[in-house]
Amino acid sequence: MKGYRKYFVNKLLWLLVTTFFAFILNFILPRLMPGDPVAAITARIAQGMSNSTGMKEFYQQYADLFGTNKPILEQFFLYIKNVVHGNFGTSFSQYPRPVLDIIKSSVVWTVCLQFPAIIFGWIIGNTLGALAAYTKKGFDKVLMPISIFVSNIPAFGMAVILLVIFGVNLKWFPTSGGYGFDLIPTFSWRFIWSVIVHYQLPFWSIVFTAIGGQAIGMRSMSIYELNADYVKYSRFMGIKDRKIVGYVFRNAMLPQVTGLALSVGTMVGGALVAEIIFSYPGLGYTLLNGIMGQDYPLISAVTLIITMMVLLANFIIEIVYGLIDPRIKAAQSD
């Protein structure tokens, strides 16, 4: 247990260091965008005004309000202080609405869409890869070309393919939104059914993107394990094939858990693209609106939340991996 404790503390320290740099990048990157958001707000509010002095006063008022006229270092420490207290500021593009109000519902939509889809795609992909390695012949010959083809389709490509086929041509599913535009969010069966129907295309676009690569990886690892010396020895000793296969797939699964941790960031990025294409009311669509409106607080808040979701998912996967792989404890004990 001492070895695992050392492993846990090491991963926790890396999480804290990465989080610190995430704060810095989430503050700096939106401010590197061209344009002046305060000037855009002033122009929108002061439409029709011909008095340049009045417009300058408006500009100064909003620059003071948002703190954009303060030194960049002072802005950064103020940003850290506000975020620690759960205050992401006021939206530039939707003033005077607080950023936290905007992203509250978006987080729920994103979490409910992305993580079930990523985990489901990972499970299905690994199951298909294991079956292909074990059965070989026909199933393997069909699965491998399909998996290679699917794994090379980018996230936006898969989303567009499903949108065109099942949304535009067949009209089986709606093409945009999280629910019907004529509905108000309630717990009525009509609203719930609308959410389920709108959920399908974004969900399956993420699942299909995840399946291909996982199936290829699991097949390769399973074939390697099936040809290992301990499998041949076990068969020579007369151990039942079902028991041997259980050990084989357990060993083959360990690198796939690591692969999930490494690829979860890419998967989340692809899922955000799917949200944008389907106008799904998650963080991806909110982030797009923030970028279009040069909304520093909204962009910083959304990217920080996405980053933290990915970091925490990686951390949890690595901690679970340490529990299921005894080699981790042994290595840390040395």
What feature does the model see in each segment?
Residues 14, 120-121, 147-150, 163-167, ...:
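Transmembrane alpha-helical core residues of multi-pass small-molecule transporters
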Residues 2-5, 103, 107-139, 155, ...:
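Alpha-helical transmembrane segments of integral membrane proteins
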Residues 19-74, 171-191:
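Hydrophobic alpha-helical transmembrane segments of membrane transport/permease proteins
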Residues 11, 144, 160-161, 247, ...:
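Residue-level recognition of transmembrane alpha-helices
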Residues 53-85, 278-290:
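Short hydrophobic, aromatic-rich alpha-helical segments embedded in or entering the lipid bilayer
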Residues 25-32, 79-81, 146-177, 205-207:
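Membrane-water interface segments at the C-terminal ends of transmembrane alpha-helices
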Residues 1-4, 65-126:
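An internal, D/E-rich "acidic patch" concept
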Residues 9-15:
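N-terminal signal-anchor/signal peptide hydrophobic helix marking the start
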